Amino acid sequence: FPTRRSSDLEFLYRLRFKSLSGWIGYAHSNFMREIDLNSDGVIWEERENYPAKYNKPQSFMAVFSYKLNNKYNLGMTCVYESGQTYTAVIGKVHQAGQQNFHSLEKPYDYFGNIYGKRNGSSYPNYIRVDLNVSRKSKLFGLPGAFKVQIINVMNYYNVLLYNWNHDASPSKVEAYSMFPRVITFGW
């Protein structure tokens, strides 16, 4: 069975002034996994001791709400996190067991990935700022609030995953983002 080690330091501060409320949080953490993959009773430091997938050493979040008057509220959320860990592809190799050679048109058909150290790389840092405005109102006699929100105001490209294309020579990597700037509204 795998064992896990973690160390963590967290800070949370709640704000409460006249019209401004919210909180600020910071966490510094380290999560490691240790597993005997080949069941030989020996842990190989370079392959069987690695950062957990959810290891994000730095995490900062701030949430603010400002009450303009009895009807209108402004809100802001700021997030900064270290990038999530992943196992990087460091090369490609022909998988001779499947077929010796496919064709001259597609010579890279039976290539597979050569992986680096398990969870030894990190995606770029995750940065996001959201803004919102809400107005108290009634809809069909029911109390509520109409809200407009801009998610990812800075339109920062937060990488969700990498996709490796071995059909190209040299191999190409393409990054996929979570979402661009999005404007939402609702009641």
Model-derived features: positions:
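Gram-negative outer-membrane beta-barrel transporters
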Residues: 4-86
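Extracellular loop and loop/strand-boundary signature of outer-membrane beta-barrel proteins
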Residues: 4, 45-51, 116-120, 170-175
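C-terminal beta-signal and adjacent terminal beta-strands/loops
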Residues: 79-109, 123-130, 134-187
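Short amphipathic alpha-helical surface micro-motifs
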Residues: 55-59, 68, 116, 128-131, ...
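Context-gated lysine
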Residues: 16-18, 53-56, 67, 71, ...
